[in-house]
């Protein structure tokens, strides 16, 4: 509480939040340049006013640009002259309205030009100083306004001895301006799918409940016939062009479809599972996942599932003892296939080629930024990524530590349209002072509901980096001013307000991101 505000009895007894900025903050180091390691920085007042208006416009107009890289967790190595192209192929989506909003300095330059507004080149990160081959991406606009590009001919040869690598995406704007270089998550290199019985002693290649997977089918093991399970127009399809990532959940057979409690643990054959599209949220009914060998579903196998295993998905049946129906593709449609029991082995069901799927784990990484404020032609990368927030302190002052990657000394933390004093610690840590809630409006003293503001980062050249995080201020109880002839409050009003006070006298932060 600020002691100066208690001298006037007409004022309420203190702020409605336990987070406030002490006066000593005014004499801290102020600078609009990159901060030194361990020093607090804030933009000068004359710059802060301009920046605040620009950040407010960014937040209101939603002019962000997102680069989304989607790829498999593992890649099979190629030997000799063979080329085992990555399957599913790495793909890139460009999303957000900012791709259609050009910075002022580029509008005149690009108005007379035609052709794609951005070009992409994807390859493997370099090994031992060698220049990796890259593949050009041809972006196509999707019905949902996203741009889609796919690298279908990438592979890793046996001359590359690495156990892990990353994909590198280079984006260039029309006119030759370098937008940036973006990296994927780590990809594990394997020689071939494991044929041994899997054990939970080595979980490196096992698939856990809640992880993301892709499913594809190859008729007669021919690469040209590859079809991927995907979602289009609200329906499941088998696509030769695009693939989707699905969250694979262990399901509870006693719950209704779409209302199952997620369970932890590694997925085993014979488990009841449910596939949920990570983009649309559309689900398939709960199904039993079966191991496939020689085009037969093995009904008595319960070992853990491994990367690039052949599997089948059986729909639960009310008639025990039957072979059951299985998830199957028919050209581009997804249908049910009625299997039959193997004449010689009752614990096997005969399938057709279209009912046998290959399962593989997937990864994705999103980079979001906005160039609408920036007066620079510098690349937007490295894009800072926030992974977690850690709140410390309370009462008169609180600090928030941002954990993530790609941080540098030229970044400032913003709460909504309010800049926070920021200290750079390391490429994985930024610390800021939580702004006083009074900075968000003159009516803050009488608030009875929480205030939630987005947490963003701003580079020294005004390049804006939104994040999926937000920060919530929660009010503390204080008496409202009484109006003349106002009705006396109910006897239990104080008790009610006190209970609200106990519920909300905490400051919380929440992560809002797609699941």
From Swiss-Prot:
Limits of the IPT/TIG domain: 384-474
Stored SUPFAM superfamilies: DNA-binding protein LAG-1 (CSL), E set domains, p53-like transcription factors
Keyword Transcription regulation: yes
One GO term of the biological process aspect: positive regulation of transcription by RNA polymerase II
Superkingdom as given in the UniProt entry: Eukaryota
MF-aspect GO terms: chromatin binding; DNA binding; DNA-binding transcription activator activity, RNA polymerase II-specific; RNA polymerase II cis-regulatory region sequence-specific DNA binding; RNA polymerase II transcription regulatory region sequence-specific DNA binding
Protein family (similarity comment): Belongs to the Su(H) family.
Protein name in the entry: Recombining binding protein suppressor of hairless-like protein
Organism: Mus musculus (Mouse)
Lineage: Eukaryota, Metazoa, Chordata, Craniata, Vertebrata
